[in-house]
Amino acid sequence: MNIWLSMLTTTGLGAIIGGFTNHLAIKMLFRPHRPIYIGKFQVPFTPGLIPKRRDELAVQLGKMVVEHLLTPEGIGKKLTNEEFQKGLIHWAQVEVDKVITNEQSLRHMLGKWDVAHVEKEATEKIEQVITEKIQAFLEEYYTYTWEQALPHSVHEKIENAIPNVSAFILKRAIHFFESEEGKSRLSKMIDDFFASRGALLNLVGMFLGNVSVVDRVQPEVIKFLGQDGTKQLLTDVLQKEWEKLKGRDVKELETFVEKEMIVSSILSAVKVEETVSKFLNQSVQQVCEPVRETIIEKVVPGVVTKGLKWGTENVESILHNLHLAEIVQQEVSTFSTERLEELVLSITKNELKMITYLGALLGGMIGIVQGLLLLFLK
């Protein structure tokens, strides 16, 4: 009985000592958190291993992340994974669709993003671009003649329109001279004519009577305007004037209308500020609806695919410029010892318990061996 009690005692003591020793060793990895002094003498093994080597641990963790976890090869493989790409494209489509179907106005969205000033800047920029384009256009065309400046199709249209213009002018002239206003104007012209010819012609005019002269001249004028020869004459005159105009420089236009006036007139007609304001008052959905399907089905997948391709090709450079090792090192260095202890224990809790139990098991086995040795020695 005493023999079995001795063996049980040595086994129990061995297990307790082995388990406690391992448990103490694990605790000494983290504790104490700070060095302990007796007078000027620092107690050995203080602080614990991890608090003492925290800076070195931070450096090594940074290297481990860069060299073994977030490697260019691993990230590149992930970026080229077909399932990952499909998932990312689907996520991007959902998020973009949320944005482009928003019923809030563009103005409200700009204010929300603190870029409300973009309306003024956009107006000024558009007006500046229009002004520059017009000025560049005029600078170029002012070096041409009208024949060079106008397209061949315009030349043809003008030349084909000249006979019609002649007919229109004569038709309007006939209509005018048939009216009372035209007759009155013709009468005044006759009066002025006789008045300028001296007393003799004035006497003849008085003898014939003004009304009778107008009544005689008016039908002749109308008859003259209605003749084909008159139409051909006017057509020839207009044709000659057109030929002269084609040979003149476009720059001569500047003597009648200055560049600034042309630019100002075009800007007034375009109404840039009003157009921009109306555009911004529309909802995001109204603006994007015509191209919504194109954006979701073509633009988003294309952008995501190209972005992933670019990321795959430049992943090494990106990781290098991110300085991940330094980021990890800085973050770990800012951890308190308590937080670092919690972090390590949350990862290795079960394994550390097993180490404690293993120490108890080994201690118990050593106790059994000691008990057997004592038995044989007796």
Curated annotation (Swiss-Prot):
Taxonomic superkingdom: Bacteria
A Gene Ontology term for the protein's cellular component: plasma membrane
Keywords assigned by UniProt, alphabetized: Cell membrane, Membrane, Transmembrane, Transmembrane helix
Residues passing through the membrane, by range: 1-21, 357-377
Topological relation to the membrane, as annotated: Multi-pass membrane protein
Pfam families (UniProt xref): DUF445 (PF04286)
Annotated localization: Cell membrane
Family: Belongs to the UPF0754 family.
Protein name: UPF0754 membrane protein BT9727_0767
Species per Swiss-Prot/TrEMBL record: Bacillus thuringiensis subsp. konkukian (strain 97-27)
Taxonomic lineage from the root: Bacteria, Bacillati, Bacillota, Bacilli, Bacillales
